[in-house]
């Protein structure tokens, strides 16, 4: 169990001298994390979470998940950003993108509160019709607009359907002691789980935020935490030349300084697609501030080779690719021979799909690097709970280091307030009257 960083496709883009120069800078960034001297140090709790996770809380998560699996046909997870992306990515990677159709050993799991679309929420309600439903609402404050609105609608549905018994089907993942959702849960008798004070949303996948939905999906969350703890131990290694996480953070920084402002996360495994969304939030929200940062994007190959492949090969040379390579797929098929061979593919007969997929990956990496796009490859041995936990910790650690290398606070997100103020003003929220008039004038209303 480990992630291997392949650097051979960086030749001509990143020099050994540059890497040597980055070593002391990375060491300084790591000290800011480990010694809690960097900006945002009050949100460093995720660093030791895999080892120090509250065992009583973990037991309650297991018990609640088992109850939900026994008495529920549909679990609706209500949250946005880090409050849902981690769980969704884990379920799709470790179970299947088709989990709700194939997961016959547990309830279907749908995600709400991640947008403001009325039609989306109406369809969630339709999926709940005639089914035994439970809710898992995730919010530290309980007042974030999207999940709060979705919870208002879904809570109403639950109370009309179950009456007082609805309380036994609502699970809240929220602050330990304060906030609107915590107060409401205490009043109504809903079971609660804790989002630690020192863990921010996008770093919270290894808390109840991610672990409860994962456990309901039948994922071994003890193995997830064990994999993350192994990463925590192995990556606490000051030998820069042999630490793939530190080297990954350094390479990203070098490429940014060379004008490669876009990082594309690429995988040849469709199960990884939602993980790409999680990475986009993790890195985009952590690094994108003070006029700095790499812009994170994601592609699903080979699908996107038939759309974005043209741009990556021949477009602006301001990007690089980070390829996540799963050595052993979750399942595989072998190509059969066709006597007619009308498609001309009999030369592939007897080959496993993973072999074909790997050759496609290798050919693409060679083509893109020749076209001026640096590629770094992160090899993950297999798709299982331990490797997932290891991978999640790897990326979070690299993100914290990368933020400090940039000179930004990787644990805040001040930029998200601008659109919220405008939205609240336009919706007529009390206290925003002057801004509302200003914005309506700009909109010509």
Regions found by a protein language model. Name each.
Residues 1-69, 337-343, 347, 435-445:
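Extended, charge-enriched "interface" segments that sit outside catalytic cores
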Residues 48-50, 74-81, 134-141, 261-269, ...:
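Short glycine-rich or small-residue beta-strand-to-loop segments that form or flank ligand, phosphate
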Residues 60-73, 124-133, 251-261, 312-317:
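Glycine-rich phosphate/diphosphate-binding loops that line cofactor/substrate pockets in enzymes
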Residues 66-238:
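Glycine-rich phosphate-binding loops that contact phosphosugars or nucleotide phosphates
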Residues 92-95, 126-128, 152-154, 186-188, ...:
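Short, solvent-exposed amphipathic alpha-helical segments in soluble enzyme
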Residues 161-321, 327, 413-445:
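Active-site phosphate/pyrophosphate-binding segments
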Residues 297-383:
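Helicase-primase coupling helices
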Residues 364-427:
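C-terminal helical cap and adjacent loop that interface with cofactors, partners, or active-site loops
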